[in-house]
Amino acid sequence: MLIIRRHLCFSVSLIFMFLALPVEVSNALEDTKRNSTLITNVIIYDGSGDNPFKGSIEYSGELIVEVYRQEVESNGYQTIIDGEGLALAPGFIDTHSHHDLGIDEQPMAVAAVTQGITTIVRAVDGFSDSPPSKTSSSSRNDYFSIKEFKRYFSDIPVAINMASFSAHNSIRFRVMGDDFRRVSTNEEIEMMKRLVIEDMEEGAYGLSTGLEYDPGIHSSSEEVIRLTKAIAESVSYTHLTLPTNREV
Protein backbone atom coordinates (compact mmCIF):
# COMPACT_ATOMS: atom_id res chain seq x y z
CA MET A 1 0.00 0.00 0.00
CA LEU A 2 2.89 2.31 0.80
CA ILE A 3 4.35 1.78 -2.64
CA ILE A 4 1.01 2.55 -4.26
CA ARG A 5 0.72 5.75 -2.24
CA ARG A 6 4.16 6.80 -3.36
CA HIS A 7 3.23 6.21 -6.98
CA LEU A 8 -0.03 8.03 -6.42
CA CYS A 9 1.73 10.99 -4.82
CA PHE A 10 4.28 11.06 -7.63
CA SER A 11 1.52 10.95 -10.26
CA VAL A 12 -0.39 13.76 -8.59
CA SER A 13 2.80 15.82 -8.37
CA LEU A 14 3.45 15.30 -12.08
CA ILE A 15 -0.09 16.37 -12.92
CA PHE A 16 0.25 19.57 -10.91
CA MET A 17 3.70 20.22 -12.39
CA PHE A 18 2.45 19.95 -15.98
CA LEU A 19 -0.63 22.01 -15.15
CA ALA A 20 1.63 24.75 -13.80
CA LEU A 21 4.15 24.54 -16.65
CA PRO A 22 2.14 26.49 -19.27
CA VAL A 23 1.62 29.29 -16.76
CA GLU A 24 5.36 29.45 -15.98
CA VAL A 25 6.27 29.40 -19.67
CA SER A 26 3.70 32.09 -20.36
CA ASN A 27 5.08 34.26 -17.57
CA ALA A 28 8.63 33.77 -18.86
CA LEU A 29 7.58 34.79 -22.36
CA GLU A 30 5.84 37.87 -21.01
CA ASP A 31 8.98 38.81 -19.06
CA THR A 32 11.02 38.42 -22.25
CA LYS A 33 8.61 40.63 -24.19
CA ARG A 34 8.71 43.32 -21.53
CA ASN A 35 12.50 43.54 -21.99
CA SER A 36 12.50 43.20 -25.78
CA THR A 37 12.15 45.37 -28.85
CA LEU A 38 10.01 44.23 -31.78
CA ILE A 39 10.68 45.47 -35.31
CA THR A 40 7.61 44.83 -37.44
CA ASN A 41 6.70 45.01 -41.15
CA VAL A 42 10.32 44.96 -42.27
CA ILE A 43 11.95 43.27 -45.28
CA ILE A 44 14.42 40.75 -43.83
CA TYR A 45 17.61 39.59 -45.55
CA ASP A 46 18.79 36.82 -43.24
CA GLY A 47 22.28 36.43 -44.73
CA SER A 48 21.68 32.90 -46.02
CA GLY A 49 21.36 33.94 -49.66
CA ASP A 50 17.66 33.06 -49.71
CA ASN A 51 15.10 35.53 -51.00
CA PRO A 52 14.16 38.30 -48.56
CA PHE A 53 10.82 38.10 -46.78
CA LYS A 54 8.57 40.44 -44.87
CA GLY A 55 8.43 39.71 -41.18
CA SER A 56 9.32 40.83 -37.68
CA ILE A 57 12.38 40.53 -35.47
CA GLU A 58 12.43 40.51 -31.69
CA TYR A 59 15.68 41.39 -29.94
CA SER A 60 16.79 42.04 -26.39
CA GLY A 61 20.05 43.83 -25.68
CA GLU A 62 22.59 42.45 -28.14
CA LEU A 63 20.71 39.19 -28.80
CA ILE A 64 18.12 38.34 -31.45
CA VAL A 65 15.35 36.49 -29.61
CA GLU A 66 13.25 35.42 -32.58
CA VAL A 67 12.73 36.00 -36.30
CA TYR A 68 9.07 35.83 -37.32
CA ARG A 69 7.81 35.18 -40.84
CA GLN A 70 4.21 35.67 -39.79
CA GLU A 71 2.31 38.54 -38.22
CA VAL A 72 3.10 38.94 -34.52
CA GLU A 73 0.92 40.27 -31.72
CA SER A 74 2.82 43.38 -30.69
CA ASN A 75 1.21 44.00 -27.31
CA GLY A 76 3.50 43.81 -24.29
CA TYR A 77 6.83 44.68 -25.89
CA GLN A 78 9.03 47.31 -24.31
CA THR A 79 9.57 49.04 -27.67
CA ILE A 80 7.91 48.58 -31.05
CA ILE A 81 9.51 49.87 -34.25
CA ASP A 82 7.54 49.97 -37.50
CA GLY A 83 9.93 48.91 -40.26
CA GLU A 84 7.52 49.52 -43.12
CA GLY A 85 9.50 50.45 -46.24
CA LEU A 86 12.82 49.50 -44.63
CA ALA A 87 15.14 46.51 -44.92
CA LEU A 88 16.99 44.67 -42.16
CA ALA A 89 20.09 42.53 -42.66
CA PRO A 90 23.16 41.26 -40.81
CA GLY A 91 26.02 43.75 -40.66
CA PHE A 92 27.98 44.16 -43.89
CA ILE A 93 31.67 43.25 -44.14
CA ASP A 94 33.80 45.79 -45.99
CA THR A 95 36.58 43.61 -47.39
CA HIS A 96 38.60 46.55 -48.73
CA SER A 97 38.44 49.35 -46.20
CA HIS A 98 40.35 52.46 -45.20
CA HIS A 99 37.96 53.33 -42.38
CA ASP A 100 40.70 52.43 -39.90
CA LEU A 101 42.52 55.68 -40.70
CA GLY A 102 41.50 58.07 -37.96
CA ILE A 103 39.25 55.57 -36.22
CA ASP A 104 41.30 55.95 -33.04
CA GLU A 105 40.20 59.59 -32.96
CA GLN A 106 36.63 58.85 -34.14
CA PRO A 107 35.91 55.41 -32.64
CA MET A 108 32.17 55.60 -33.37
CA ALA A 109 33.07 55.00 -37.05
CA VAL A 110 29.97 56.89 -38.17
CA ALA A 111 30.86 56.71 -41.88
CA ALA A 112 30.88 52.91 -41.66
CA VAL A 113 28.00 52.11 -39.32
CA THR A 114 25.59 54.46 -41.10
CA GLN A 115 26.10 52.29 -44.19
CA GLY A 116 25.38 49.12 -42.23
CA ILE A 117 29.05 48.11 -42.06
CA THR A 118 29.93 46.30 -38.85
CA THR A 119 33.25 44.69 -39.87
CA ILE A 120 36.12 46.11 -41.90
CA VAL A 121 39.22 44.46 -43.34
CA ARG A 122 42.18 46.84 -43.10
CA ALA A 123 45.81 46.94 -44.29
CA VAL A 124 44.79 46.44 -47.91
CA ASP A 125 46.80 47.58 -50.96
CA GLY A 126 49.91 46.27 -49.21
CA PHE A 127 49.95 49.10 -46.65
CA SER A 128 49.46 48.93 -42.89
CA ASP A 129 49.26 52.64 -42.14
CA SER A 130 49.99 53.92 -38.67
CA PRO A 131 47.09 55.90 -37.18
CA PRO A 132 47.46 59.71 -37.27
CA SER A 133 47.62 60.04 -33.50
CA LYS A 134 50.48 57.54 -33.34
CA THR A 135 52.65 59.65 -35.63
CA SER A 136 52.60 63.28 -36.70
CA SER A 137 50.66 62.17 -39.77
CA SER A 138 49.43 58.88 -41.20
CA SER A 139 52.59 57.27 -42.55
CA ARG A 140 52.85 54.46 -45.06
CA ASN A 141 56.57 54.29 -44.35
CA ASP A 142 55.97 53.40 -40.70
CA TYR A 143 55.13 49.68 -40.61
CA PHE A 144 52.30 48.96 -38.16
CA SER A 145 52.53 45.26 -37.30
CA ILE A 146 49.53 43.20 -36.23
CA LYS A 147 50.97 42.96 -32.72
CA GLU A 148 51.35 46.75 -32.54
CA PHE A 149 47.87 47.19 -34.03
CA LYS A 150 46.29 44.94 -31.40
CA ARG A 151 48.19 46.58 -28.56
CA TYR A 152 47.37 50.10 -29.76
CA PHE A 153 43.62 49.46 -30.03
CA SER A 154 43.34 47.34 -26.86
CA ASP A 155 42.27 50.42 -24.87
CA ILE A 156 40.26 52.07 -27.64
CA PRO A 157 36.74 50.60 -27.89
CA VAL A 158 35.63 51.12 -31.48
CA ALA A 159 32.14 50.62 -32.86
CA ILE A 160 33.10 48.11 -35.55
CA ASN A 161 35.06 44.87 -35.81
CA MET A 162 38.44 45.07 -37.53
CA ALA A 163 40.25 42.26 -39.33
CA SER A 164 43.66 42.87 -40.83
CA PHE A 165 46.05 41.71 -43.51
CA SER A 166 49.81 41.60 -43.22
CA ALA A 167 50.95 44.36 -45.56
CA HIS A 168 53.72 43.65 -48.08
CA ASN A 169 54.59 47.26 -48.98
CA SER A 170 54.86 48.39 -45.38
CA ILE A 171 57.00 45.37 -44.52
CA ARG A 172 59.25 46.11 -47.50
CA PHE A 173 59.70 49.67 -46.22
CA ARG A 174 60.60 48.31 -42.79
CA VAL A 175 63.27 45.98 -44.19
CA MET A 176 64.73 48.07 -47.02
CA GLY A 177 64.15 51.63 -45.83
CA ASP A 178 64.61 54.29 -48.50
CA ASP A 179 66.76 51.93 -50.55
CA PHE A 180 63.72 50.13 -51.99
CA ARG A 181 64.03 50.98 -55.69
CA ARG A 182 65.71 47.68 -56.50
CA VAL A 183 65.25 43.92 -56.29
CA SER A 184 65.55 42.64 -52.74
CA THR A 185 68.34 40.31 -51.66
CA ASN A 186 67.83 36.80 -50.35
CA GLU A 187 68.56 38.02 -46.81
CA GLU A 188 65.99 40.82 -47.12
CA ILE A 189 63.33 38.42 -48.39
CA GLU A 190 63.99 36.17 -45.40
CA MET A 191 63.56 39.16 -43.07
CA MET A 192 60.26 40.01 -44.79
CA LYS A 193 59.12 36.40 -44.44
CA ARG A 194 59.74 36.50 -40.69
CA LEU A 195 57.66 39.67 -40.34
CA VAL A 196 54.81 38.21 -42.41
CA ILE A 197 54.83 35.00 -40.37
CA GLU A 198 54.83 37.02 -37.12
CA ASP A 199 51.78 38.93 -38.38
CA MET A 200 50.02 35.66 -39.21
CA GLU A 201 50.78 34.26 -35.77
CA GLU A 202 49.24 37.40 -34.26
CA GLY A 203 46.03 36.90 -36.25
CA ALA A 204 46.48 38.44 -39.70
CA TYR A 205 43.93 37.28 -42.25
CA GLY A 206 46.50 36.92 -45.03
CA LEU A 207 48.98 38.93 -47.09
CA SER A 208 48.02 42.00 -49.11
CA THR A 209 50.09 43.49 -51.92
CA GLY A 210 49.89 46.63 -54.02
CA LEU A 211 52.38 45.97 -56.79
CA GLU A 212 51.70 49.23 -58.63
CA TYR A 213 52.84 51.40 -55.73
CA ASP A 214 56.20 52.14 -54.15
CA PRO A 215 57.90 50.09 -52.87
CA GLY A 216 56.05 46.98 -54.11
CA ILE A 217 56.44 47.95 -57.76
CA HIS A 218 60.17 47.25 -57.45
CA SER A 219 59.73 43.77 -55.97
CA SER A 220 60.59 40.69 -58.01
CA SER A 221 58.22 37.84 -58.73
CA GLU A 222 60.49 35.66 -56.60
CA GLU A 223 59.98 37.96 -53.61
CA VAL A 224 56.20 37.87 -53.85
CA ILE A 225 56.11 34.11 -54.48
CA ARG A 226 58.34 33.33 -51.51
CA LEU A 227 56.28 35.51 -49.18
CA THR A 228 53.00 33.96 -50.28
CA LYS A 229 54.44 30.45 -50.03
CA ALA A 230 55.41 31.20 -46.43
CA ILE A 231 51.70 31.54 -45.62
CA ALA A 232 50.34 29.20 -48.27
CA GLU A 233 47.40 28.01 -46.17
CA SER A 234 46.02 31.53 -45.67
CA VAL A 235 44.68 34.20 -48.03
CA SER A 236 46.76 36.32 -50.39
CA TYR A 237 45.15 39.48 -51.70
CA THR A 238 46.49 41.83 -54.36
CA HIS A 239 45.12 45.21 -55.37
CA LEU A 240 45.12 45.70 -59.15
CA THR A 241 44.08 49.13 -60.41
CA LEU A 242 45.62 49.89 -63.80
CA PRO A 243 46.48 47.53 -66.68
CA THR A 244 50.21 47.00 -67.00
CA ASN A 245 52.56 44.69 -68.85
CA ARG A 246 53.74 43.17 -65.61
CA GLU A 247 53.10 39.48 -65.06
CA VAL A 248 50.40 38.69 -62.52
Predicted regions and their residues:
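Divalent-metal coordination cores built from histidine and acidic residues
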Residues: 86-87, 92-93, 97, 105-207, ...
